[in-house]
């Protein structure tokens, strides 16, 4: 194949392959896990952990950073800070440092107020000895190095997801679904159910049909065989990783106002401000936006939809770590039902109550998050393989 015909994941693997074959003393990797499936990421992690040279990585993949790095350098407010350990150690140490500085700040403020009260009281006596004592304390106060209050953690987006109405208990029933493109069979005769309140992650290698499944459920494309049924009062909100739900020729403001004409200009601006679009930025045309900016517009529309069944295709793509954490919080507080495709293992661990792995044209069901999946993967894969052989 020519490289210009390859997918994002295939191009990433080719670039990594060329780089690793040179066996350099230092590797400089910019978002190396982007577009890679879980098996490819696991292989890369193992390679890097056994690599003898130095590795310098820019990444938003928290699970990857936990597995691979031994030191974290953070750029914040124009300054560099260094932390020993992996991402988890960095996150914990940063919080400890902030808590200690905050405690030091409040203790100093309390002491300053106490000394100021004592000085005021001494001066109120209006005696020479008391005034000298007050002046002495004032000089000591002037020599104090003031501790600055630590800045609040930056929360760039702020939003919540709330369904307009409660759906029935049976949200989605998939029966004997099959799909193939030309000679490539994606999945065959698959059946599963999703109940109200479940947060279901779909995982699997690239090209196995995960996104295709979501498009079938959103009636973007048709299945070859089988059917699916939505339950009572189910309303779907769809997040498309390629952002086809957005209109390239519209401005951000028009994207919201055209879909939600009942909103006032102020309400639209307030909504967009929650997703970091302020002032004249709301009049940017969709086609001029970056992937992360399009993602924020799509999330804004998702919030306004008030749907009770969210179907999300790679929702953390192009989001920075702070935005991912805010999205995780919103999804964990969401009272509706979620079905999503993701390669972000940290995100899956934080938000999934169940995992469907697409492997060998069928789905393997795991009742738990990503840690549970890793624990049970070999056992359940063998069980499903045996049942498939018996069916055949």
Q: In which residue ranges do the predicted regions lie?
A:
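Conserved phosphate/pyrophosphate-binding and hydrolysis machinery centered on Walker-type P-loop NTPases
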Residues: 109, 127-134, 164-168, 320
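Proline-centered turn/helix-capping motifs that create local helix->coil transitions or kinks
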Residues: 129, 142-153, 384-389
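Short, flexible, glycine-rich and Lys/Arg-enriched loop motifs at helix boundaries
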Residues: 124-130, 156, 249
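Intracellular alpha-helical coupling/juxtamembrane segments of multi-pass membrane proteins
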Residues: 93-118, 130, 134-144, 148
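ABC ATP-binding cassette signature C-motif
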Residues: 1-105, 155-392
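A general structural signal marking secondary-structure boundaries and capping sites
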Residues: 123-126, 145-148, 279, 377, ...
């Amino acid at each position: 194949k020519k490289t210009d015909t390859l997918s994002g994941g295939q191009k990433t693997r080719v670039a990594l392959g060329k780089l690793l074959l040179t066996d350099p003393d230092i590797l400089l990797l910019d978002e190396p896990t982007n577009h890679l499936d879980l098996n490819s990421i696991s292989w890369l992690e193992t390679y890097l952990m056994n690599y003898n040279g130095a590795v310098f990585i820019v990444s938003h993949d928290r699970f990857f950073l936990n597995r691979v790095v031994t030191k974290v350098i953070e750029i914040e407010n124009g300054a560099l800070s260094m932390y020993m350990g992996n991402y988890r150690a960095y996150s914990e140490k940063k919080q400890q440092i902030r808590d200690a500085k905050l405690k030091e700040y409040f203790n100093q403020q309390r002491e300053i107020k106490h000394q100021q009260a004592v000085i005021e009281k001494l001066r109120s006596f209006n005696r020479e000895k008391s005034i000298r004592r007050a002046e002495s304390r004032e000089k000591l106060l002037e020599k104090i190095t003031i501790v600055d209050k630590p800045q609040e953690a930056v929360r760039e987006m702020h939003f919540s997801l709330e369904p307009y109405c409660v759906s029935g208990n049976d949200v989605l029933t998939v029966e004997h679904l099959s799909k193939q493109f030309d000679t490539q069979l994606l999945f065959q005769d698959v059946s599963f159910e999703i109940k109200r309140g479940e947060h279901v992650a779909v995982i699997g290698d690239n090209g196995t049909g995960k996104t295709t499944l979501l498009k079938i459920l959103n009636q973007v494309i048709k299945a070859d065989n089988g059917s699916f049924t939505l339950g009572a009062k189910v309303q779907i909100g769809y997040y498309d990783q390629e952002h086809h739900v957005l209109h390239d020729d519209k401005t951000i403001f028009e994207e919201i106002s055209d879909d939600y004409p009942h909103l006032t200009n102020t309400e639209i601006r307030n909504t967009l401000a929650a997703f970091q679009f302020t002032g004249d930025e709301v009049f940017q045309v969709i086609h001029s936006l970056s992937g992360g900016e399009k993602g924020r517009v799509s999330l804004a529309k998702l919030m306004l939809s008030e749907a009770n069944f969210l179907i999300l295709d790679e929702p953390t793509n192009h989001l920075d770590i702070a935005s991912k954490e805010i999205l995780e919080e919103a999804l964990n507080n969401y009272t509706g039902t979620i079905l999503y495709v993701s390669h972000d293992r940290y995100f899956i661990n934080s938000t999934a109550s169940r995992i469907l792995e697409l492997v060998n044209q069928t789905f393997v069901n795991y009742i738990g998050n990503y840690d549970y999946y890793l624990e049970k993967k070999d056992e359940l894969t063998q069980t499903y393989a045996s049942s498939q052989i018996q069916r055949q």
